[in-house]
Each structure stands twice: as structure tokens, then as C-alpha cells.
Amino acid sequence: MIKNHWMKKLKYLSLFFLLFAIYWFPDVILAYPEVYLKSLVGYERQVVATWIFLGNMSISLFLGILICYKLGYYKNTISIFKIKNLLFLLITTIILFVIYFFSYTYYNSHFITPGIAKTQAAFSIQIVFPFVQFITIAICAPIFEEASFRTTIYSFFKNDKIAYIVSCVGFAWMHTGPNPILIVYLPMSIVLTSIYHRRRVLGESILVHGVFNALLPIVIPLLQVITGLYYL
């Protein structure tokens, strides 16, 4: 009994790191362009980097989705499309945008240091075409991050309250590190974790996360124009 308990812990701990290894695999080409693309410059370099990255990303997505499917991570996904669940997700997404808008505006008014995620995004755009960055943040990030920080962490911890706290803090910290921008990512993480915590349906948090990431560059400037709030 005790042995099975610790084997289960080891299984999900290993799975957490495996999912992130697969998730970050395509970023090798972004992290070391001077090694892989040393002889290329300008547009030619960007084209080659983009195709290599897309190839690696396709492999990563296939492996990640396959692993999660085999482990039953996507069970009850169809239930998302019930009217009451769609309405809940729509309202939650709107709330998420509003919370992010105010926390992000406050952060920009008082701090200038970018977080890890923002720095990585700015760097990657210099190497591959912008549409690749969009695919990464709107599709890859939600699939891998939600699987790791929601279902895997909830499977690792027997106590749901501990799992909730670790999921919220861990997700936010992964994006920011020891940085004041944590005040932006922590509320976002709490909302996404709460979505998963409600029914334990991974597809719901993936959907909201993906829509949020995809529309963020449009919604935030729009809210700034509508409210007139650029600083808090």
C-alpha cells in the first residue's frame, strides 16, 4: 500500500517534468540560434528557424496530447459544450480579462521589470515569424501548462486544498520568477485553477487559457481606450 502510494507520487512527479521537457523542446532552436543557424542571416535565417521550430512544435504537441489522452486527462471534455458550462466559461473569461487589465495596468504604473514570459516572447519574435509565437501562446502553452499545473498536480497531491495552492502559486511563479509582475500572474493563475477545480475537466481551463492568450493583445488595448485607464 505504502509502496503504491509513493510509486504514484513518483509517476506524476516524473510526468510533470516530462510534459515540460516536451513543451520546451522546440525552444532549443530559439535559445541557441547562434549554434544551429550560425551560417544564416536576416530573412533566410528567420525562415529556416520558423520551419524547424514548427516541425519540433508539431512533434511536441503530438506527444503531449497523446500522453495526456492515454492517461485520461481529457475525460468529460465533451461536457464543456453544455450551455450552462459554456456560459460559466464565458463569464469567467470576461472576469479574467478584467482582473488582468487592472492588475497589469497597476503593474505598468509602478514597475518596469518584465517577467520571464515577457522576456522570452520578445526574444523569440526576433528569431521566428510572429505567427509562430501566436501558435505557441494560444495552443501549445494552454495544452501543456494546464496539463502540468492542473491535472498532474491535482493527481500528485491527495489533498485538493494543497493542490489548489501549489497549482496557483507554481503556475504564476513559472511565468514570473522572483519578480513584482507576480501580482499580475497570480490572480490569473487563481482564476484558471478555479476553473479546473470546479469540475476537474482539463478541457475547460485549456479553452479559457487559450482564448485568453489569443485575445489578450486585442482586448487590453481595447479596454484602455474604453476606460481611458493607462495608469493606476
UniProtKB/Swiss-Prot annotation:
GO terms for biological process: CAAX-box protein maturation. The keyword Phosphoprotein does not apply. Belongs to the UPF0177 family. This is UPF0177 protein in abiGi 5'region. GO terms for molecular function: endopeptidase activity. The chain crosses the membrane at residues 12-32, 47-67, 86-106, 124-144, 165-185, 206-226. The function of this protein is currently unknown, but it has been shown that it is not necessary for phage resistance. GO terms for cellular component: plasma membrane. The lineage of its organism: Bacteria, Bacillati, Bacillota, Bacilli, Lactobacillales. It is found in: Cell membrane. It is a multi-pass membrane protein. InterPro entries: Rce1/LyrA-like_dom (IPR003675). Keywords: Cell membrane, Membrane, Plasmid, Transmembrane, Transmembrane helix.
